[in-house]
Amino acid sequence: MKDLISNQLVKYLEARGVKHVFGLCGHTNIAVLAALSKSRKIKFVNTRHEQIAAHAADGYARATKKASVLLSHLSPGLTNAATGVANAALDSIPMVVIAGDVPTHYYGKHPHQEVNLHADASQYEIYRPFVKRVWRVDSPHLFPEIMEKAFTLAESGRPGPVLV
């Protein structure tokens, strides 16, 4: 039986000592929320808007001096959170933004809430101007390595947000 990426993510966050994940429920992150609900070490802070979640994650990182974690829904979730993430970037606040996505076989077919006028599944590109790095995980076996790189980059040099 294979281990789902959502379960791998929660195990990774627990091993890193993450205690809170901020975000909003959505159909593209429901598997992560299900995995988080089984964790005794991580509390999901459910907000009523993605911008609130981003600002809460920003404030949490400022208070704890550690990278915070923001869990976002695709498309409107990402655009709604952009102001809070950009604010963290301007103030050098470490944050790992994890965005849900639709299955790859839906790319370019305009599934529910896809913000994509060019049919290339690149909606994460809206974050590129203000985050340190953007990753799209196309190969599940690369996920653990990408998460490690994401946290390391968010907290090193001039700290700032990254998007996975």
PLM-predicted stretches and their roles:
Residues 1-164:
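N-terminal alpha/beta PP-like core and its mobile active-site loop of ThDP/TPP-dependent enzymes
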